[in-house]
């Protein structure tokens, strides 16, 4: 590398400056896209995926003297083509906060563990001794259902896979769930219910082929800015291309919208049915496609809101226990069902102008226009999140606009490996790898065979999901709990009443593995210091099915260790006699006396690759600790679940040479579009389109109605609260709030409010207010200007700020099918602080 910049590099640097200026940030030298001069010659560069969202941007990571000193967009990465968003340009700083955790911390009093004690540094041996003692006591007294783990869409693939083995096969508990339950569960359930397989059929290449983009509950300009640049490039470079943006308030993505639609919260259900009706009434159903490739069903209605069973809304719900039921139907019945959603009715219900609704419907109905639908939390964090996901598939299936370049219903992802780890590995309470489930006896048997464990080890009943875990902790039914790579006391709904109380329940022992002292960590009994990002070898899977692997580039500080090391090392403290039932051991005496480490991780699969296979230019502390290439062993064992079943992954070593590959990877080739002949190797010549995840090869078109949210404004609590993110921060802010430039750009959460609403209440711009719900309250300053422009009766508060815990206010209602929380709709009142 020389000290000179090429014209291309200058353009990339200029783009970075524009992105930074948008956020009001000056790029320091450490964040420059391409450092130059003599200093650059002393930096070693290696590839890795970005640590933040699910876009999966490639970055080049610069290391000098054992520390990450710079990052820039990877110009060889197809996803981002050298660009990064403003968070990505500050990746070099996320690991170096001054309060980085470097040693285990245990609550102690008088030299021994005490629930009400103060945190004191301890050795790893003491930490694991106390941890194992607590786990064994709970297992002996209450059994496997009292042991649980809460993981993350930020786990590497190896970490998630190790967790699912440790919990399901080791402790025989399905009480494993990821924080992706809060963000992607509705999308995953809808994929499975519609296509029989999870994850998008398209890819990011669709951005260069679509003639229309429809954003449903997605502020891509701030939350997926790199993909937004690809969308904007297509829109601004081609006059015929249109953009529609639907939201409950006006945000930055609407600056590019040809069809800006602000609707009343929850009424997107009605809009989707109106569009389906419009397609049918105007005679633009692709009848040949529908006849050959779809089947019709009717969903159960009045399904409740996923609240506690004794909540009045659950008691009166007719089908709360059968929420997922779908009954066979036909096209004529579907036509009759959606015919009730007339333009006039939907205008009245949603508050949207008729002209905008008609223009939107015509985008989907026009047979000559390729449409890409995009959505994130506005759809998924919804008490009818599975429904709205399936309803957008209805539109693409009715018109045949699916599984080909530019015609793509595309669920965007919020975490770097919510797809690759939470969904593909199967760290949800009901799942196994490669779309298999614990409720299916053949799937359990298959997993037990791959894992080389006795039949009958994996329990058949799904475990507690994320919100239910909090409730069970509070109720004293879940007593040993290990949290990794998430900040759930800040992130969970109704956290003051349902989450924090469970963490501090004296009957429970809570372990949190993290890199910083988050609210969740400080609520625990034992804190384990974790390695992060390039301090370990890792693999992520992004939103377009792209698996990306990286080497360990630097060491973690102090005694911090990777989550993988922590789980595998902890498994050595248990023998099968302590965790498996007597009848299983009597039938399989060869397993007696073995440690879980021997059974799960030194099983002839995971330990089959010697450490000598690791690239000599890179460290691998886990391989040093265990004596074999554990990441490769875990990956190859995991990959055996999906090969030949439509989830094929390439050999592990190939990923080190690639900027990621999109599965299924068959005969060395990645798949860009699934389910269509000519693109997907699983679709045979002559089949055209085949949704092979379902036995009949047909996708489901589902009839479901508009139903109101769990809570709406009334005379006292007369404002809708919507929560979400901002450009500068990611999730709970535990990383980005420690980057000085990002903190200065947006130092604290504010209450975005309609100016007229503020005037009516005598509230000035910048004034402090109380945001009060039936569950709790916080204080924040009012913002009536700026990026988010609120309609009357709606406020928006981001949740990154630990000093303003907006989730003290939110409602713990969930989609009854997916169990995903609705963070977008609850009722509050705004009270001026005089």
Curated annotation (Swiss-Prot):
Q: Which CDD domains does the protein's record reference?
A: MopB_CT_Nitrate-R-NapA-like (cd02791), MopB_Nitrate-R-NapA-like (cd02754)
Q: Which residues form the signal peptide?
A: 1-31
Instruction: Name the Enzyme Commission number(s) assigned to this protein.
Output: 1.9.6.1
Q: How is it modified after translation?
A: Predicted to be exported by the Tat system. The position of the signal peptide cleavage has not been experimentally proven.
User: Can you quote the record's cofactor note?
Assistant: Binds 1 [4Fe-4S] cluster.
Q: Where in the cell is it found?
A: Periplasm
Enzymatic class = oxidoreductase
Which GO cellular component term is one of those annotated? nitrate reductase complex
SUPFAM superfamilies, from UniProt?
ADC-like (SSF50692), Formate dehydrogenase/DMSO reductase, domains 1-3 (SSF53706)
Short name of any one Pfam family annotated for the protein? Molybdopterin
* Keywords annotated in UniProt: 4Fe-4S, Electron transport, Iron, Iron-sulfur, Metal-binding, Molybdenum, Nitrate assimilation, Oxidoreductase, Periplasm, Plasmid, Signal, Transport
| InterPro entries, sorted | Asp_de-COase-like_dom_sf (IPR009010), CT_Nitrate-R-NapA-like (IPR041957), MoPterin_dinucl-bd_dom (IPR006657), Mopterin_OxRdtase (IPR006656), Mopterin_OxRdtase_4Fe-4S_dom (IPR006963), MopterinOxRdtase_cofactor_BS (IPR027467), Periplasm_NO3_reductase_lsu (IPR010051), Prok_molybdopt-oxidoreductase (IPR050123)
| One GO molecular-function entry | iron ion binding
Q: Where do the TM regions start and end?
A: none
Q: Does the keyword Iron-sulfur apply?
A: yes
Please describe what this protein does.
Catalytic subunit of the periplasmic nitrate reductase complex NapAB. Receives electrons from NapB and catalyzes the reduction of nitrate to nitrite.
Q: What does the sequence similarity comment in the record state about its family?
A: Belongs to the prokaryotic molybdopterin-containing oxidoreductase family. NasA/NapA/NarB subfamily.
Full protein name: Periplasmic nitrate reductase
Q: Which organism is it from?
A: Rhizobium meliloti (strain 1021)
Upper classification of the source organism reads: Bacteria, Pseudomonadati, Pseudomonadota, Alphaproteobacteria, Hyphomicrobiales
Q: Its encoding gene is what?
A: napA
